Amino acid sequence: MIDIAKEHKVNEQIRVRQIRLIGAEGEQIGIIDTRDALAMAREKGLDLVMVSPQAVPPVCRLLDYGRFRYEQQQNEKENRKRARAQEVKAIKFRVKIDDHDFNTKTGHVRRFLEEGHKVKVTIMFRGRERTHPELGERILHRVAETLADIGAPEGMPSMMGMDMNMIMVPKAAPKRDSGRSESAQEAPTARSAEASRPEAPANA
């Protein structure tokens, strides 16, 4: 595979006399003069790209270098996007938190979950609060209940030093409700039953 992270010598930038050439479909063409390889590339409307300069002789390949770079850059962009989506975000709560702060922080957690992130929810204990872990568990339970429509805890809460942590993970998108389609299927049945009902005889 060609490494897009580094610059490659392309076409006339290749100054060696002979190369080992690989075709556009990955086939081995063999060792040929560079000028012949350049002529072959021009004939096919492709570029001659040096992919292994340390080999003896250097290895080159026929390809559309502009298109190749574009596709690789798009792939790298998509990979970075997926990596960001898998990033674990962190939101911290105090044991003594008022409703306003709680709602604000759970709103941040919700936004991260909607974006596809995992979220580490941390309860920070201070002083003697550490002797009452049930207070932290109560807040984490409240967080999980508040966000149950979009996320769920991954495992049980765990203590680390003066902090209690819980990981929230996004729920899968719900499947589309089939109720509408079922009712749509029932309607023709009702109409067909109505249509098949015998008409009352006309009054004489």
Swiss-Prot record:
Q: From the record, give the transmembrane residue ranges.
A: none
Q: Which UniProt keywords apply?
A: Cytoplasm, Initiation factor, Protein biosynthesis
Q: Which InterPro entries does the record match to this protein?
A: T_IF-3_C_sf, T_IF-3_N_sf, Translation_initiation_fac3_CS, Translation_initiation_fac_3, Translation_initiation_fac_3_C, Translation_initiation_fac_3_N
Q: Does the keyword ATP-binding apply?
A: no
Q: Which PROSITE patterns match?
A: IF3 (PS00938)
Principal location listed in the UniProt entry: cytoplasm
Q: GO CC: one term?
A: membrane
Provide the assembly information.
Monomer.
* PANTHER family per record: TRANSLATION INITIATION FACTOR IF-3, TRANSLATION INITIATION FACTOR IF-3, MITOCHONDRIAL
Name recorded for this polypeptide: Translation initiation factor IF-3
